[in-house]
From Swiss-Prot:
Protein name, entry field: Probable thiol methyltransferase 2
A Pfam family this chain is assigned to: TPMT
PROSITE patterns: SAM_MT_TPMT
Gene label: HOL3
Binding site for S-adenosyl-L-methionine: W29, W33, W40, G67, D88, D116, F117, Y132
Disulfide bonds: none
Keyword annotations from UniProtKB, A to Z: Methyltransferase, Phosphoprotein, S-adenosyl-L-methionine, Transferase
UniProt-listed CDD domains: AdoMet_MTases (cd02440)
InterPro entries the record matches: SAM-dependent_MTases_sf (IPR029063), TPMT (IPR008854)
Lineage, top ranks: Eukaryota, Viridiplantae, Streptophyta, Embryophyta, Tracheophyta
Residue numbers of Phosphoserine PTMs: S79
EC class name: transferase
Gene3D superfamilies, A to Z: Vaccinia Virus protein VP39
S-adenosyl-L-methionine is among the record's keywords: yes
Length: 226
């Protein structure tokens, strides 16, 4: 009965989220956070990110998590060797994450900002960017712009980690259907090389079989004309 209750609650959250997005596409994300309609929020760090942190498999330096939401992954990645910026267009999400995590021992190694990913201009570029449930939030026509921003925000030789979801057949969104080829189509022309693309064996619950972990290296010699 408990699992049935959780499933019903999750479906209700999804229904409310889609209604808010359909009513106000530009402000739907903020409305969703205000209403607590965030069905994508796991309530904990993404398991594969926790695994990569524990095994020392992430680059050090400056890291960015766009569309960070509550910020669990931001906090999990932050350390003396890695300062992490969590970016979200929702002011409510950023206020909550800042309040929730500001007293943690590693709080000086992360920060949260409410900014538009497509117009934000940070003072420094990043060594690492992690994308999960962000690429899939945009209609397919926006994906080339997403890739251009990733290229601009990463340092030469920097790494982009894409947790690809949802790899399935669906109409509409968000989340919009994704595939490996959709990432390749927009990243490879901008000088990104796929270092590895594997099934995410640590995917949670209903997302199992619908995710792949992609690790991309930005060329050290590619020069964008954008």
């Amino acid at each position: 009965m408990e699992n049935a209750g959780k499933a019903t609650s999750l479906q209700s959250s999804r229904d409310l989220f889609h209604r808010l997005m359909s009513e106000n596409s530009s402000g739907g994300w903020e409305k969703s956070w205000e209403a607590g309609a965030t069905p994508w929020d796991l309530g904990k760090p993404t398991p594969v990110i926790a695994h990569l942190v524990e095994t020392g498999s992430l680059p050090n330096g400056r890291a960015l998590v766009p569309g960070c939401g509550t910020g669990y992954d931001v906090v999990a990645m932050a350390s003396p060797d890695r300062h992490v910026v969590g970016l979200d267009i929702s002011k409510t999400a950023v206020e909550r994450s800042t309040k929730k995590f500001s007293t943690l021992p590693n709080a000086k190694y992360f920060s949260f900002l409410s900014e538009d990913f497509f117009t934000w201009e940070p003072a420094e570029k990043f060594d690492l960017i992690f994308d999960y449930t962000f690429f899939c939030a945009f209609e397919p026509g926006v994906r080339p712009l997403w890739a251009q921003r990733m290229e601009k925000l990463l340092k030469p030789g920097g790494e982009l980690i894409t947790l690809m979801f949802p790899i399935d057949e669906r109409s509409g969104g968000p989340p919009y259907e994704v595939s490996v080829s959709e990432y390749e189509k927009v990243l490879i022309p901008l000088g990104f090389e796929a270092i590895s693309i594997v099934d995410n064996e640590l995917a949670v619950g209903p997302r199992k079989g619908m995710e792949k972990l992609g690790r991309w290296k930005k060329s050290s010699t590619f020069h964008s004309t954008l």
